[in-house]
């Protein structure tokens, strides 16, 4: 059985040294013998480098560093059958001729051959200095490029605006050469732009004296003779320092803190709390101490809900509803105009609920109240007091009442209040319950003053869904019923103002009979449909007909419109409203003819 022999690694050549015993390679393990000879395909040792044998002409010029030619030839024959073993501490001196061709000394790694380099001859590549080749232009003619041609044409327009030299061949050749020269200079990577020479003091002073001959300093002196002039050159440092000796040192301005616009950052830095942000003057509602705990975006959101009533709406614009209008005058208008009279037991209620079928004018009554009481009117919906962030809804409700108390007298009108103050149940979300609780506390809680002129006016068409606590806080619950026959006649007369018609009192009686059970919104839609009757009779002549030639609106148009526009309120809903008003209402139900 073959067994591998322990061999010693040759440090110089990287080969394994032959065993000292005279055994034959045939007696060794085959892979060991192949690896020892350096011809095994599995040999993973350090690869040897083969030195290309020199030509006779080159070898004749090179002299051996240690031995003569005869001794060297004998040494070459001796090295054909042995492997040189060198010690690690031995150093080899190598010298080459400067005229030797470096291409013949290239070495390449190989496997399976014996080393044939001479003793002391270790190839070393010759270092060559890299010469910097001069920049040369490409063979492409950039002068014929489209962009270059456009630029050259613009330059020609500046140089020769009259086009007198455009046909001159010398001018064309000169412009073409200048273009190529400019491209060559701009494309040269070694090109460095020369800096303009700096002007000395005398040149600058002469220039200033030429441009501004009558210029003097604030003291009336000549700027050239002034002792406060700044040195313009650095040639004499002693003169520069001497000229600045009389100038007092400039004091550094104190650092002015920048105003932070992000409310979250301002709150984190303590700039919105008491004692913070003293360098900044707060203005508007943000300066109020009661609003210091709210963010600026919350206050801005509440301010955006303040409605300015540009068109004044009177009680006469609200047809019918005499009982509701009388109650609202006593609750809202008169206490706001005479707060000295309505005090103590005469203090008005803080909550008024308007309920009834849709389209009866509840929102219009709210606009009329805002116009008549001359108070700050907040038009609030459920979306104004809700947020996707937990806890923000309660802050919005609290901020709403805080801003309203700062702008007394105030009226907070909440349309469709049932979506905000519906009955609390176990299945509702916790955030909705907290918003309702905060609203009820702000409406009538411990911190509310009894004589403050703040009114919450709510409107809903589903009063049976309101929470019990909310129903108690609305002391006045007014039923806004369907318009009575006289109210429907008044609505038709108000809507036909400005429209040509032939409606008489007898026709109004006919319209009153046709519109039984109609709400205020249904009456408006009926009048709009009747007013379109004359327009439909014109047909295709609408583009050419004169406005005065359009016929008037008649009772027949109302009869045709009544066939299209039907009442939107069901009798069962009217019965439910009447039952709730009988149980919780504050006004006697009006008599409605059906």
UniProtKB/Swiss-Prot annotation:
GO BP term, example: ATP metabolic process
One Pfam family linked to the record: AAA_lid_3
Summary of pH dependence: Optimum pH is 8.0-8.8.
Effect of residue 471 to A: Abolishes ATPase activity
Top EC class of this enzyme: hydrolase
Comp. bias intervals (Polar residues): 56-73
Effect of residue 360 to C: No effect on ATPase activity
Region of interest called Disordered, as start-end residue ranges on this chain: 1-79, 239-261
Protein name from the UniProt record: Fidgetin-like protein 1
Organism: Caenorhabditis elegans
Gene: figl-1
